[in-house]
Amino acid sequence: MRTTYMAKPNEVERKWYVVDAAGKTLGRLASEVAALLRGKHKPTFTPHVDCGDHVIVINADKVELTGKKLTKKLYYRHSLYPGGLKVRTALEMRTNYPEQMIERAVRGMLPKGSLGRQMFKKLHVYRGSEHPHQAQKPEVYELRG
């Protein structure tokens, strides 16, 4: 009888990928990055083990949004005090906090739980084209979309 292969946490080999967000649509970029972080691109993917790779996203400030989302899409956060709801448009987020915009989109596509939080720690987002991870020798990953 054959048994299904289950990856073990200490057997997982992690690679580093660089993804250029310049000119890419936010949601399409986030879904592919989330798949890389989960390890869905590997034949050894196991749902209950973090077998994903590290992903470096550069040029976060050049990510695109379709339609009127730059002015219409709103990002909410709350200070947990009465009347503490803060609202920012996507345009404000892209100009002032582009890293948070991509991180929020990717986090929403990862599992909700301790495994998802562990996967999210392997995401590294940078505003410009420079990043401090040259020592890891990251491969350039071309997005499909």
From Swiss-Prot:
<comment type="subunit">
    <text>Part of the 50S ribosomal subunit.</text>
</comment>
<dbReference type="GO" id="GO:0003735">
    <property type="term" value="F:structural constituent of ribosome"/>
</dbReference>
<dbReference type="InterPro" id="IPR023563">
    <property type="entry name" value="Ribosomal_uL13_CS"/>
</dbReference>
<keyword id="KW-0687">Ribonucleoprotein</keyword>
<protein>
    <recommendedName>
        <fullName>Large ribosomal subunit protein uL13</fullName>
    </recommendedName>
</protein>
<dbReference type="Pfam" id="PF00572">
    <property type="entry name" value="Ribosomal_L13"/>
</dbReference>
<comment type="similarity">
    <text>Belongs to the universal ribosomal protein uL13 family.</text>
</comment>
<keyword id="KW-0689">Ribosomal protein</keyword>
<dbReference type="GO" id="GO:0003729">
    <property type="term" value="F:mRNA binding"/>
</dbReference>
<dbReference type="GO" id="GO:0006412">
    <property type="term" value="P:translation"/>
</dbReference>
<dbReference type="GO" id="GO:0017148">
    <property type="term" value="P:negative regulation of translation"/>
</dbReference>
<dbReference type="GO" id="GO:0022625">
    <property type="term" value="C:cytosolic large ribosomal subunit"/>
</dbReference>
<comment type="function">
    <text>This protein is one of the early assembly proteins of the 50S ribosomal subunit, although it is not seen to bind rRNA by itself. It is important during the early stages of 50S assembly.</text>
</comment>
<dbReference type="InterPro" id="IPR005822">
    <property type="entry name" value="Ribosomal_uL13"/>
</dbReference>
<dbReference type="InterPro" id="IPR036899">
    <property type="entry name" value="Ribosomal_uL13_sf"/>
</dbReference>
<dbReference type="InterPro" id="IPR005823">
    <property type="entry name" value="Ribosomal_uL13_bac-type"/>
</dbReference>
